[in-house]
């Protein structure tokens, strides 16, 4: 993992350099600083979250007598985990209690490699709910963790505006072009291209969308918070207020 982070840090520096050479304002100091603060703060909880996820998956695996093994088992495990990633991502973009766990990732109005560092500190504690089904299919907990980590690493390098559409890969695997669409502020955009590595799931389930010129990054009506704690908590507060308003409206109609 340290080697991956080193490569990622170098990639950020290169993106900054290329952006300056091309005279493109891809980075905002405050936004970048906030993303980095969020990353390092979340890293402090990362070990605990990862341990919790492994413990929950291992507990679920105890109830399943069959196991996937060998090369075929590894390939199947990756496909299963990638599909579950798609389903989790789709739930995160629905109007449910899970939406606040993902909102902070989409609130930035900038879009560069540091955008991928934006994440809810609470996210690791809901991940087991979505990947436990892999245990029922015979996946090995360590293999699921590895596949999940590989998807996360792959996602690191999708958040860039400098890579154009890659014709042969678009609609097959996730690309920077496809992921840019996902970070658009229109509902039809951020509810599309939800796959982790493969976009086959989006193709099959009708959520694939090609990149167009009308992209504006961020979320309509939601300003990015610069305070780490406010950024982490406010999505849940806003969601709770919305639910209470619906409840009160329902009571008022009777």
Set out the residue ranges of the language-model regions.
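Membrane-embedded catalytic scaffold of the fatty acid hydroxylase/desaturase
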Residues: 40-49, 67-222
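Hydrophobic transmembrane alpha-helical segments in integral membrane proteins
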Residues: 1-9
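A transmembrane-helix-recognition feature enriched in membrane-embedded lipid enzymes
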Residues: 35, 40, 196, 200-204, ...
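Generic alpha-helix structural propensity
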Residues: 27-31, 35, 39-43, 47-52
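A membrane-cytosol interface segment of integral membrane proteins
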Residues: 216-254
